[in-house]
């Protein structure tokens, strides 16, 4: 379960749950197709679509300029007859 880091719970994501959309932070190296296959196998659901976004890199305030990679956030829309449990226990 290293692919999905955590499930995001905010006001916006709770609104998206009504549209059958779930939001996860995932490993930044993964593609949409890999995430889709993994979600369908792990949760036994059918994915309708996936939207992905990355937040800007964080810059350090040290003497030498460095940047760190941020996670990729995926918004996964499921077909109407499927759902995912709200919290993932590790």
From Swiss-Prot:
GO terms under biological process: translation
GO terms under cellular component: chloroplast; ribonucleoprotein complex; ribosome
Disulfide bonds: none
InterPro entries given in the database record: Nucleotide-bd_a/b_plait_sf, Ribosomal_uL23-like, Ribosomal_uL23/eL15/eS24_sf, Ribosomal_uL23_CS
GO molecular function: rRNA binding; structural constituent of ribosome
Gene3D superfamilies: 3.30.70.330
Pfam family, one: Ribosomal_L23
UniProt key word Chloroplast: yes
Localization, UniProt: Plastid, Chloroplast
Cited PROSITE patterns: RIBOSOMAL_L23
Keyword set, alphabetical order: Chloroplast, Plastid, Ribonucleoprotein, Ribosomal protein, RNA-binding, rRNA-binding
Principal subcellular localisation of the protein: plastid
Family from the record: Belongs to the universal ribosomal protein uL23 family.
HAMAP family with a match to the protein in the record: Ribosomal_uL23_B
Assembly and binders: Part of the 50S ribosomal subunit.
UniProt function note: Binds to 23S rRNA.
Protein name in UniProt: Large ribosomal subunit protein uL23c
Species: Psilotum nudum
Taxonomic placement: Eukaryota, Viridiplantae, Streptophyta, Embryophyta, Tracheophyta
